[in-house]
Swiss-Prot record:
Its main location: cytoplasm. The gene is fabH. The last Arg residue of the ACP-binding site is essential for the weak association between ACP/AcpP and FabH. Residues 248-252 are annotated as: ACP-binding. This is Beta-ketoacyl-[acyl-carrier-protein] synthase III. It comes from Tropheryma whipplei (strain Twist) (Whipple's bacillus).
C-alpha cells in the first residue's frame, strides 16, 4: 500500500517582536495578566507591506532547500489560510509562480486554525491515490490585519506567520488516519465582526472576536475526545507518542488538553505560542518547526497534531516527524 510522509519543514515568522507592554494600555491590562492567561511573552507580526504570499513563499523556500528539491519536483501545492485579500488567484498559484513550479495542482482551503491539519489530510489522500507524488503544504495567516487594539477577547493573542511542509510517497505510514469535523451550532463563538465587502457600504473594517470561555471549554473537553479518537483509529497509545503539537491557541488550553489526553511526562509539548503568538493556519507547522529545531532527536518519532478553530471545526492526525 502507498503511504506519505513529511520530509522537510520551512518557517516564516513576522519581522517584529511585539511584547505585551506594547498592547496593555488600550485593553487596561498587564504583562502578568496576559502571560498568566495565555502564556504569551511576545508575538511575531509582519511589516505592513508584507503579504501572505510573501510569507508563504519564504516558508516554502526553506522547506524546498531542506528537502533538496527543485521546484519542478512539486506537483501539488495546498495552502491553508483565512487572510488572503486577493482571493484569486489563490495563494497556492502565487507561490507556485514565485518558486517556479511547472505544472501542479494549486489549491487554497479555509478551515481557520484547523487548516493545516485539513491540508495534510488532503495531501496525504492525493499522494495515496496517485494523483500527486510530491506536495508542498503551507499554513499561512496575517492576523494583524484584523486586530482591534481595544478588544480584550483575542487581540493580544494574534500574530503573523507561515509554516510549510513537503510530503512525498512512502512505503511506510508517515501520516496517520485523520479525524475531522465541525460544530456549526457554535458559529458565532469566534470569527470576524463583518466582511470586507461590508466596508463598501460604510461599515468599519472587520476585526476578530471570540467568546473566550465557550471556546476554552470546547477546545479542552471536545478536542480531548477528538484527540483520543485519533489515537484509537491509529491504534496508538498515549505512551507511544514522543511529541504533542496542538494548535497554539493559548497555553492553558494546551496544558489542559495534554492532561485530559493522559500524555506521559516524557512527551514534548509544543509551546511555540509563548514567543510566536497565535498564527491560526500557520500555528501547527510553526510549532513543529520550532520543536524539531530545538530537539533534533525527534526526527523519525511519532507526534499527535490537532487543529481547532472558527466554524467551529477541527482536524488532526498522527505524524512521523521529519
Amino acid at each position: 500500500m502507498r503511504y506519505s510522509k513529511i520530509v522537510s519543514l520551512g518557517a516564516y515568522r513576522g519581522e517584529r517582536d511585539v511584547y505585551n507592554d506594547e498592547l496593555i494600555g488600550p485593553i487596561n491590562s498587564s504583562d502578568e495578566w496576559i502571560r498568566r492567561r495565555t502564556g504569551i511573552i511576545s508575538r511575531k507580526r509582519a511589516l505592513s507591506g508584507t503579504t501572505v504570499v510573501d510569507m508563504a513563499y519564504a516558508a516554502s523556500k526553506e522547506a524546498l532547500n531542506d528537502a533538496q528539491m527543485r521546484p519542478e519536483d512539486i506537483d501539488l501545492i495546498l495552502v491553508a489560510t483565512i487572510t488572503h485579500f486577493g482571493h484569486t488567484p489563490s495563494v497556492a498559484a502565487h507561490v507556485g509562480f514565485r518558486i517556479g513550479v511547472q505544472d501542479a495542482i494549486l489549491l487554497d482551503i479555509n478551515a481557520a486554525c484547523a487548516g493545516f491539519s485539513y491540508a495534510i489530510f488532503q495531501a496525504d489522500l492525493m499522494i495515496k491515490s496517485g494523483v500527486a507524488s510530491r506536495a508542498l503544504v503551507i499554513g499561512v495567516d496575517k492576523l494583524s490585519e484584523f486586530i482591534d487594539p481595544l478588544d480584550r477577547t483575542i487581540s493580544f493573542l494574534l500574530a503573523d506567520g507561515a509554516g510549510a511542509a513537503i510530503l512525498v510517497g512512502s512505503t511506510s505510514m508517515g501520516i496517520g488516519k485523520t479525524v475531522c469535523g465541525g460544530n456549526p451550532g457554535q458559529l458565532e463563538s469566534v470569527g470576524l465582526t463583518g466582511s470586507t465587502t461590508d466596508v463598501k457600504s460604510g461599515s468599519a473594517w472587520p476585526t476578530l472576536r471570540q467568546e473566550g470561555s465557550s471556546i476554552f471549554r470546547w477546545a479542552v473537553w471536545q478536542m480531548a475526545k477528538v484527540a483520543k479518537q485519533i489515537l484509537d483509529i491509529n491504534q496508538v497509545q498515549p505512551g507511544d507518542l514522543n511529541a504533542f503539537i496542538p494548535h497554539q491557541a493559548n497555553i492553558r488550553i494546551i496544558d489542559e488538553l495534554a492532561k485530559q489526553i493522559g500524555l506521559e511526562e516524557n512527551v514534548l509539548i509544543a509551546q511555540d505560542i509563548c514567543k510566536t503568538g497565535n498564527t491560526s493556519s500557520a500555528s501547527i507547522p510553526l510549532a513543529m518547526h520550532s520543536l524539531i529545531k530545538g530537539n533534533p532527536s525527534l526526527s523519525g518519532e511519532l507526534a499527535l497534531q490537532i487543529g481547532f478553530g472558527a466554524g467551529l471545526v477541527y482536524a488532526g492526525q498522527t505524524v512521523v516527524m521529519p
